[in-house]
Amino acid sequence: MSAPLVIVAPPGHPLAHLKKIPLKRLQEEVFLVREPGSGTRSAMERFFAEREIHLKTGMEVGSNEAIKQSVQAGLGLGLLSRATIEQELELKRLVVLDVAEFPIMRHWYMVHRRGKRLSPVARAFHDFVLSEAKQLVGSGLARTKPQRHHNTDRAGRPK
């Protein structure tokens, strides 16, 4: 399932209504980031490092919810999975910035051992996740067929 990462701001932020914001412009902003080791933070650091963009970190936090609340309070910008901010977008508490080269596409996978039969509970969970993913596909936020990322080997490990 695809999980696009987007940059969010409070609705009144100066960048909120601009189009195709250049990446270099983001160097002037303060970012609220996840803790070291977080997949979101790793994707963010890799993306900006590859483009030689250096962001200012205002605060490290341990949850997406803390980033959402801090961004809403005007403490900085955040990078979050689009799937985690639907309610805030609907309530107009956050806006997704239109940034060049965005969104960053991440992928979530569900795996289990080949040939191993899933328990009834595991099967119910598997079916539930796939059902939810199919609903997201209709919204354009997800894809249920796993595809290998061009920067990974056949096992999904970074090259």
Predicted feature descriptions by range:
Residues 16, 39, 95-139:
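A late-sequence structural motif
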Residues 37-47, 53, 129-159:
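Ligand-binding clefts/hinges and TM-proximal coupling segments of bilobed small-molecule sensing domains
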Residues 11, 82-84, 101, 108:
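Short secondary-structure boundary segments
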Residues 24, 68-69, 123:
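Alpha-helical segments flanking ligand/cofactor-binding loops in enzyme cores
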Residues 37-97, 153:
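Hydrophobic hinge/microswitch elements
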Residues 8, 33-34, 60, 78, ...:
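Active-site-adjacent beta-strand anchor residues
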Residues 1-31:
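Flexible hinge/capping segments at coil-to-helix
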